[in-house]
Amino acid sequence: VWEVLKKQTSKLTRHRCEICAGRGRRWPVECHEVWLYDDKTHTQTLVRLIALCPMCHKVKHIGLASVNGEFEEVRAHLMKVNQWPQQSTAEAYIARAFEIFEERSRHEWTLDISYLKQFGIDPATMKRPLAGTVRLLPVMSPISVLPNSDVPFVSEADFDPFDHIINNERVA
């Protein structure tokens, strides 16, 4: 099932990254899940699948990239895509994303993958235990690629390091 969804997502974007329009060296793009987090009900909802080049995908999982010794390269990509000349801008953004991640990791989350129904997948009958209550794992901390830093979020609650921006418009 995942292989089919991956290929479909890649094909829809003509095998280009939805954030930077780039392609990877070994394979063009990877499939990434976009989640909406409700911090009041602690519900994590799958809202979309997107195609990301391997570098943008590593930015989304910068904690894992750091563990793998790729932090500097990934931070440089984050800065390049967002046109941030100051390393301190990227560091502040990453620090804030980790703060939000750490706060969210203190809670148990209900996982809503009903999005998959549109592909003929019934989450209730899946063999793997995807639906239910989960805990976020700090090593896998996702982080977004944002447009230029002058694009404001509506409020602190609206800041979500887990969503992404396409063409300077926030996509949930």
What is each PLM-predicted segment?
Residues 6, 12-13, 30-32, 83:
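Residue-level signal for functionally critical sites in structured catalytic/ligand-binding pockets
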Residues 18-51, 60-68, 72:
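Histidine-centered nuclease catalytic patch
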Residues 4-5, 33-42, 118-119, 132:
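A broad "ordered helical/assembly scaffold" signature
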Residues 1-16, 21, 40-43:
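Short, charged surface segments at domain edges that flank catalytic/cofactor-binding sites
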Residues 14, 22, 58, 83:
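Residue-level marker of positions within ordered structural domains that often coincide
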Residues 47, 59-172:
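A detector for short metal-coordination/catalytic motifs
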Residues 2, 27, 33-35, 84, ...:
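A residue-identity detector for tryptophan
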